[in-house]
Amino acid sequence: MTKDTTVVLGHHGPVDNASHRGAPLSTGAEWTFELLAKYDRAIGAIAVDEFDLDCYPNQIEVISSEQMLDAYSMVGLPIGYPHWSFGKSFIHHEHEYRTGMRGLAYEIVINSNPCIAYLMEENTMPMQALVIAHASYGHNSFFKGNYLFRQWTSADAIIDYMVFARQYVRDCEEKHGVAAVE
């Protein structure tokens, strides 16, 4: 789903108050990976130091609208098994998007450890900052601290489970045939 656009970010220690108080971190709409990292450090300092959020490390991936449509069709999961219904879903979402019948999310979050946030490359820098604060820290902290999520899900094992499930479906198809598994 991604193309060399992964930036592993997170709270990397203290950020002096001058960097997130007063002078803006940037003034334009354009973003760079360096600027995303700078915003992440500043937002992380506020989230952790001032709001006492407890978060998993962040893995921020910047994706295109085409990749976001692909993520929609895979129900937001970064790893899945091949199935015709995902292609059907992709075509449906793509048609609605291309004809202006729907917009795309600014982000998708996988509540795992590390927390994976997919940001749209079309977002402006202010929107990227909002998404980092909302998804990479807000969702992240909420799910890390949510007792029901912890009771029924292991954030450390979500990705491994998806790999297992994909292989299980493939094994079943090989053993019983695609039609029987369908």
Predicted segments, located by residue:
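General structural signal for secondary-structure boundaries
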Residues: 64-67, 124-125, 173-180
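Short pre-active-site segment immediately N-terminal to the catalytic Zn-binding motif
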Residues: 94, 114-132
